[in-house]
Amino acid sequence: MEAAAPASHAAAARGRLRSRQYAVLGLTFAAYASFHASRKPPSIVKAVLSADWAPFSGPRGPHRLGELDVAFLSAYAAAMFAAGHLADRADLRRLLAAAMLASGATSAALGAAYFLGVHSLAFFLAAQVASGVVQSAGWPCVVAVVGNWFGHASSRGTIMGVWNSHTSVGNIAGSVLSAAVLEFGWGWSFLVPAFVIAALGVVVLVFLIAHPMDAGLDIEAIEVEMNGGSGEEVELLGEDKKEDEDVLEVEAVAELPRAIGFLEAWRLPGVAPFAFCLFFSKLVAYTFLYWLPFYIRHNAVAGQFLSHKASGILSVVFDIGGVLGGISAGLLSDKIGARAVTSALFLFLSIPALILYRTYGSISMHHNIGLMFLAGYFVNGPYSLITTAVATDLGTQDAIKGNSRALATVSAIIDGTGSVGAALGPLLTGYISTRGWNSVFFMLIVSISLALVFLIRLAKDEIVSKISARH
């Protein structure tokens, strides 16, 4: 009976841990989905702006729309590196909530331009730059929070693959919401997602628990006890056991490892190759994010051109494919224990998927939907895997003795480098599309090929390691 008591106590602690983990996973999922939803309106309203809203109408319209994309993405990429450094040192809950509220404000400002009759290119560019800066804090924060709660999970790839579907879910929600209200004026396409992200920012501020220690939970002690440890009582740092909260907070801060330096993080094994791979992979993914509705609107399907609203809604098929692609990549990488091999496989298969979509997607609606789904599946698979499971692996690897305070910096380096490519893709598309969409798809295929090049050595090392382990 005496042995049963500690075991029962450990089981209760494990139950508390699991419930808190699910809550954190759900809240961060919703938070980052709202970031992506608020980024979707520019792609939905592109065709409307290019038709009759100066300064985006006329022959230079596509160029200026591309410049609008690059204003956001270049600011996002530049600020991302600083945001990761800040997230490793700041209160993650407050920083994430502030970023969400500020993102809502910048998106609302863009929507207000419709109602106020603003036609200044400088205004749109400034609003996009401000939006990019404040949104850059979102990713390092959510990755660090999830890493705090799931950093020791053996099925990290699967967990992260499912969780990272927030990217595609957010894109889908943003597309549907923006397209649904587009008929009332394009300003509403910005205002509705702005309200959603601001409201969720308040929820994050009130309810998010950024670290298990903040909830009085010691993950390592609980796992040891449940896996047949010494039988001693599991250490719970809060609620039932804490006597002096102020003293506890001081002790918790004292136990935290030092945050890793920016250049030190770049030198960690695997960080640079995956970062540059994501540069080209994200270039492709974000070209679809920002230009797919425009592409669908201006390319007939079964001989018919779709409306602005129908084009926006149809584009969500790419993101639905991306959801399943990200989950599949996470499952496969966990099963074979090879992140680089999995990413390389998806990148390789995305090349024929893009060729098929461009060549046969216009035959019928069924062809368009099926091939768009296939393209989204393979394009978003490696992008999802690298930004989540790979970044978490690299941010907690043995070289830094599992220092969880490196997580935000490493994830910011990887996603920030990818975001430079994300800025370049839509910008190039704005210029190249005037020469024909075949040229755009050629650019995308070249980008995927270059992404593959950066993974060749890592994939080879993983294969050799697996073969050696069997012998």
Language-model features, listed with the residues they occupy:
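Extracytoplasmic
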Residues: 24-55, 138, 288-293, 387
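Helix-loop-helix hairpin linking two adjacent transmembrane segments in secondary transporters
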Residues: 167-215
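Cytoplasmic helix-loop-helix junction between adjacent transmembrane helices
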Residues: 127-169
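Extracellular/periplasmic helix-loop-helix junction of adjacent transmembrane segments
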Residues: 46-78, 310
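Hydrophobic core of transmembrane alpha-helices in multi-pass small-molecule transporters
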Residues: 106, 119-137, 365-395
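Extracytoplasmic gate region of multi-pass secondary transporters
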Residues: 42-43, 268-323, 327, 383-387, ...
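Cytoplasmic membrane-interface "Motif A"-like loop-to-helix N-cap segments
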Residues: 89-100, 334-348
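C-terminal ends and interior cores of transmembrane alpha-helices
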Residues: 101-118, 348-362
